[in-house]
Amino acid sequence: MMKKPVVIGLAVVVLAAVVAGGYWWYQSRQDNGLTLYGNVDIRTVNLSFRVGGRVESLAVDEGDAIKAGQVLGELDHKPYEIALMQAKAGVSVAQAQYDLMLAGYRDEEIAQAAAAVKQAQAAYDYAQNFYNRQQGLWKSRTISANDLENARSSRDQAQATLKSAQDKLRQYRSGNREQDIAQAKASLEQAQAQLAQAELNLQDSTLIAPSDGTLLTRAVEPGTVLNEGGTVFTVSLTRPVWVRAYVDERNLDQAQPGRKVLLYTDGRPDKPYHGQIGFVSPTAEFTPKTVETPDLRTDLVYRLRIVVTDADDALRQGMPVTVQFGNEAGHE
C-alpha cells in the first residue's frame, strides 16, 4: 500500500522536471536568441535615356552622391523640339478638319452648288439638243459619222458633269456622312497621340535620378551619340538599406515578417543597428558561398530581407553583418 504514494510522488517529480526543462529550453532559446550572418544588400541600377541622340551635357561624375529628381544629363533637345512643333501643327490641321466635318456646309456653299447644277443642266440640255439635230443631219447624209460621234461625246460629257453637280448639291444639303466624320475624328485622335509621344520624347531627353544613390560608373561623355536605352550611369541605391541573410528551417519560426532584430558590424560591435524583417522567401535554396559559416553552406535555407531602420553612411553595401534575434530586439 505504501508503493502507490511513492509512484505518484515520482510521477509528480518527473512531470515537474519535464516542465522545468521545457521552460528552461524555451527561455534559453528566447534569451540567447538566434544569430544569423548576412551582408548589406548590393543594389545597383543602370540609368539610360529612353530616347536616342547626342549627349549634350552630364552633370555628375563617378563617386557623386545623387538625390531623387536630380538632373543627371541631357541630350541635344533640338530634334525633339522640332518634332514637337510638327506634332502641334498636325493637331491643328486635324482639329480644323474635324470641326469642318461637324459644322457641315454653309448656306453660301449650298447656293453655289445649286447654281452649278443649273449651269450643268443648261449645258446638258444644249448638248442633248445638238446631238438630236446631228442625228437628223447624219440620216440625210449631210454630216459625217465622225461629226455625229463628236456630238454624242459632248452630250455624254455634259451628262457626267450634271450628275457630279447634282451629287455635290445632294451632299451639301444632307451634310457630311457619319463615316466621314468618324474618319476625321480618328485622324484628330491620331494627331493628338503623336503630340503626346513628341512631348514624352522631349521630356525623356533629360535624364532624371529615380532615387537617392551614389554614382559608381559614368559610361559616356558629352558628344557621344547614343541609341535609346544605352547605359549612361551605373548607380548604387542607398535608400532603403537592406540586409540579406539566410535562416534554416529549424529556426524559421523565429524569422517572421515584422520581427525586429539587432544588426552588428565589425566597425561598431557595441552599437548595433536596428532592423525589421520585411520579407521571407517562400522557397528554400542552398546557402550561397558568401555566407560566413561554412558548415551551413550545404543546408537548405530561406532568404530574409531585413530593412535597416536607422541606417547611416557607415553601413556600406556588401558589408558583412551579424543578425541577432532576442527579447531585446522585440517584436512588432
Swiss-Prot record:
It is found in: Periplasm. GO terms for cellular component: periplasmic space. Residues 1-16 form the signal peptide. Pfam families: HlyD_D23. Keywords: Coiled coil, Periplasm, Signal. Its main location: periplasm. SUPFAM superfamilies: HlyD-like secretion proteins (SSF111369), Outer membrane efflux proteins (OEP) (SSF56954). Residues 108-209 form a coiled coil. The keyword Signal applies. Belongs to the UPF0194 family. PANTHER family: EFFLUX SYSTEM COMPONENT YKNX-RELATED, UPF0194 MEMBRANE PROTEIN YBHG. This is UPF0194 membrane protein YbhG.
